[in-house]
Swiss-Prot record:
It catalyses: 2 (2R)-3-phosphoglycerate + 2 H(+) = D-ribulose 1,5-bisphosphate + CO2 + H2O; D-ribulose 1,5-bisphosphate + O2 = 2-phosphoglycolate + (2R)-3-phosphoglycerate + 2 H(+). RuBisCO catalyzes two reactions: the carboxylation of D-ribulose 1,5-bisphosphate, the primary event in carbon dioxide fixation, as well as the oxidative fragmentation of the pentose substrate in the photorespiration process. Both reactions occur simultaneously and in competition at the same active site. GO terms for cellular component: chloroplast. HAMAP family: RuBisCO_L_type1. It comes from Iris germanica (Bearded iris). Gene3D superfamilies: Ribulose bisphosphate carboxylase, large subunit, C-terminal domain, RuBisCO large subunit, N-terminal domain. The active site is at 164 (proton acceptor), 283 (proton acceptor). Keywords: Calvin cycle, Carbon dioxide fixation, Chloroplast, Disulfide bond, Lyase, Magnesium, Metal-binding, Methylation, Monooxygenase, Oxidoreductase, Photorespiration, Photosynthesis, Plastid. Substrate binds at residues 112, 162, 166, 284, 316, 368. This is Ribulose bisphosphate carboxylase large chain. Heterohexadecamer of 8 large chains and 8 small chains; disulfide-linked. The disulfide link is formed within the large subunit homodimers. Belongs to the RuBisCO large chain family. Type I subfamily. Mg(2+) binds at residues 190, 192-193. Pfam families: RuBisCO_large (PF00016), RuBisCO_large_N (PF02788).
Length: 443
């Protein structure tokens, strides 16, 4: 028999000599225990509560193999410069998770444990997704290479623009702004994340006018153009209806808000997009609710990894230079996690584990939010070729109008890429490069 009552988690779930398996999902949590709670107990509590544990011993424990299924806290280190804060490393056996379900992965790992009384705060800093698990996901519908081939655009970042004012335009005027931007030289325009189907502009009207704008600009420029048609909706069925209508119009790309829409809806949409040749642009509305606090919540690099598994071809990833916060090294860390195949552990960039994606397609990071032409050299240098640079106000705020704003962005981008290819230092000579480029303008 066994003794009933509350028992210490660390007896079962703190296993400092555990050797992690290649199939384990590893998590790094930033734990802030309540005063008087030892670090080992707090770390073990996280492992228990996010896997097999409950607060007492139960009869049915005897009917399962805890050793096979329990999460284990296998290492704890104090955070330098913080009082009473620790990084707890937890290993989860692969069998705890449903295959191909980001939803289930998050329900298990971060579902319950964040409200835990013994912890003052808890933050999931990073996850190591083993190939045995990542291989059960489709991942991005197309990925970076397939997208470049579809668009026939190589050797430079892609340019986008969010149509502003984000709410209040009629469908026809909205389409007009789309046309002007694409005609001026942008590759993409974008529905704002809040634009779904409101009284002033229903989704079907918007889709039709945007498609018309797209084809007109395409015919006049001889380039392939796209507009991210936001398919986010109140129900999964309605979302699919919008995506299907977009495909019937023959447009190249649709868009989804993956956090507000939810991972289940997002994964369904990603599967549809791969089956039907649509690219999928992902907006991260609501991410700051989850990732902004330094000691509670989830770091965006975890949300980014989850999106690569669930599926998306573009995702917003901060700018390093614009109006929204994001530290340079950390941002570059998760940008690499999105694009690359194999990413080495590097604590200076916030990467706690080596991540091997084993040929899962990559996601293009999107820089968006308060950036404009003068940021172009910095952006080209920071993000490199495989990115989408999005200027909303930075295009539509041009004193001469939308099309000249688009021209300005395209000229600046081409100038920066050319200068970089000639070996010039964008960080030092950036402003000079932009000035040279605009010296041909009448103003």
């Amino acid at each position: 028999g066994f003794k009933a009552g509350v028992k210490d988690y660390r007896l079962t779930y703190y296993t400092p000599d555990y050797e992690t398996k290649d199939t384990d999902i590893l998590a790094a949590f930033r734990v802030t225990p309540q005063p008087g709670v030892p670090a080992e107990e707090a770390g073990a509590a996280v492992a228990a509560e996010s896997s097999t544990g409950t607060w007492t011993t139960v009869w049915t424990d005897g009917l399962t193999s805890l050793d096979r299924y329990k999460g284990r806290c296998y290492h704890i280190e104090a955070v330098v410069g913080e009082e009473n804060q620790y990084i707890a490393y937890v290993a989860y056996p692969l069998d705890l998770f449903e295959e191909g379900s980001v939803t289930n992965m998050f329900t298990s790992i971060v579902g319950n444990v964040f409200g835990f009384k013994a912890l003052r705060a808890l933050r999931l800093e990073d996850l190591r997704i083993p190939p045995a698990y990542s291989k059960t996901f489709q991942g991005p519908p197309h990925g970076i290479q397939a997208e470049r081939d579809k668009l026939n655009k190589y050797g430079r970042p892609l340019l986008g623009c969010t149509i502003k004012p984000k709410l209040g335009l009629s469908a026809k005027n909205y389409g007009r702004a789309v046309y002007e931007c694409l005609r001026g030289g942008l590759d993409f325009t974008k529905d704002d994340e809040n634009v779904n189907s409101q009284p002033f502009m229903r989704w079907r009207d918007r889709f039709l006018f945007c498609a018309e704008a797209l084809y007109k600009a395409q015919a006049e420029t001889g380039e392939i153009k796209g507009h991210y048609l936001n398919a986010t909706a109140a129900t999964c069925e309605e979302m699919m209806k919008r995506a299907i209508f977009a495909r019937e119009l023959g447009v190249p790309i649709v868009m989804h808000d993956y956090l507000t829409g939810g991972f289940t809806a997002n994964t369904s949409l990603a599967h549809y997009c791969r089956d039907n040749g649509l690219l999928l642009h992902i907006h991260r509305a609501m991410h700051a609710v989850i990732d902004r606090q330094k000691n509670h919540g989830m770091h965006f690099r975890v949300l980014a990894k989850a999106l690569r598994m669930s599926g998306g071809d573009h995702i917003h990833a901060g700018t390093v230079v614009g109006k929204l916060e994001g530290e340079r090294e950390m941002t570059l860390g998760f940008v690499d996690l999105l694009r690359d195949d194999y990413i080495e552990k590097d604590r200076s960039r916030g990467i706690f584990f080596t991540q091997d994606w084993v040929s899962m397609p990559g996601v293009l990071p999107v820089a968006s939010g308060g950036i404009h032409v003068w940021h172009m050299p910095a952006l080209t240098e920071i993000f490199g070729d495989d990115s989408v640079l999005q200027f909303g106000g930075g295009t539509l705020g041009h004193p001469w109008g939308n099309a000249p704003g688009a021209v300005a962005n395209r000229v600046a981008l081409e100038a920066c890429v050319q200068a970089r290819n000639e070996g010039r230092d964008l960080a030092r000579e950036g402003n000079e490069i932009i000035r040279e480029a605009c010296s041909w303008s009448p103003e």
